[in-house]
Structures are given as structure tokens and as C-alpha cells.
Amino acid sequence: MLNKELEIFKKNLSSYTQSCRKFFLKQGAFSLYHSKNMDNFIKKAYDIVLKDYFDDFSPPSDNIPFCVLASKAYANNSLCFNESISLIFVYKDIKAFHLKPMIKAFIEILNDAHLQIDSVILEFNGLYNASNELKTSIIQTRFICGSRILFKRIKIKFESILKENKNDFAKLLLENFKEFDIPFIKQEFNILKDFGGLNHLRSLESLLVLFKTSPKNYALNFIDEKNLSELRLAGDFLLSLKS
């Protein structure tokens, strides 16, 4: 029965991959639709793993100390079609749950289905010990599936880490803008070399999230609504071009 579910899962993902270009007709929102569809495939893969490990005795997801988070561009629903999906797997090491083999099986299912993922596995109590470069992946995160109880605790830790390391994270992100140190008149947009392209835009978005202190978009402290709208349209164009 499980093998049949896996085959159906792989078939559905393959069919989606072949037909997903239709989302280009969604008037610039194709990346949002694509990200949401990826969410559904990841949730389905998790359901298959739970059934494999718990059979008919699976506890509610909230009671399993594990959750899957989207990070980086995927968390912001600004994912290109040909781009790896950034995931963070967070678990709490509890005696009653031997979760490492389950997480490994989860990743194997995604890989076997040819879903490109860029994943990080973190133990809840070890979040503070992760390297700064790894910690920057938590600047933009979004819950996909798993325990919401654990996710609430993770959010508190993430907020604490971001607050304590804000300046260090900002320095790491600003490293991506070294090319802009040359005089403006000599700067030339070059999407092939990603000068003024999608990676710079994403680094800018991470900086804005890092220093955000209210629901209002932090960019509005520097530009008006019209310019922000133009920036978003430019981002949509770059996403479609890269896809």
C-alpha cells in the first residue's frame, strides 16, 4: 500500500513539473502558486512518512516534536520553477521519539521523487549553537507542516537569535553588495553575472525583514508606495526571466 502511495506521489509531482508553466499566465503571481503547490507536495510526503513509521497508530502532528519550515526565497513565496526548495527540518530530541531515521526517510522520499531541495536539519536545543551563516537562513521562515506547538517555541528562539545577532547578520548580507562600491556611473546591470539581479533583491528583502519592527514594510521608511510597487514588479520580472 505504501509503495503504491509513493508511486502516485512521484507521478503527481512529475505531472505537475511538466505542466507548471501554465502558472506564468497568473499575471505575475506564478511564484506564489508554485510555492503553494510545493507546500502541498511536501505535506503529502510527510503524510507518507508518518504512515510508514506509525502505521495506524500515528499521534496528532502537534504531538510529534518535529516540523518543516520553508526558508529563504521559498519562505517568501518567491521561488523560481528551476530553483531548489530551501527547507529547515527542526526536531526536539526526546527519548520517546527516535526522529532522525524518520527525517532521513522524509528526505529520501523527496529526493527519490526528483524534488530539488536544499535542506538543513536542526535540533531545537542546538539552535543557538549553529553558525552565523546557517542562522541567516532563519531570517525568513514559514511553517509548512508538523507540530505547531514546537513551531511556536521555535519562533521565540528565532526571534531571540535574530535580535542578538542582528548586526552580525546584517554584515553578512551586506557582503553581497560589494560590487556596488564602485562609482554609480560605472555600474552596469548584468543579469548573467547577477549584478543588480535576483540575488541582490533577495539580500535586500532579508535586510528589510531583519530590521522590521512593525507590520509595515520596512522599505517604506526609505521609499514610497509607488516605488515599492515598482520594485515588486521588477522582482516578478526577474523571477519569470530566471524561470
Located regions from the model:
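Generic start-of-chain signal for non-secretory N-termini
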Residues: 1-30, 108-113, 126-164
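Helix-loop-helix transmembrane hairpins and adjacent membrane-interface loops
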Residues: 59-60, 76, 81, 93, ...
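Conserved nucleotidyltransferase catalytic core and NTase-mimicking acidic/glycine-rich helix/loop elements
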Residues: 164-243
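Conserved catalytic core of two-metal-ion nucleotidyltransferases
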Residues: 35-43, 49, 58-61, 99-153, ...
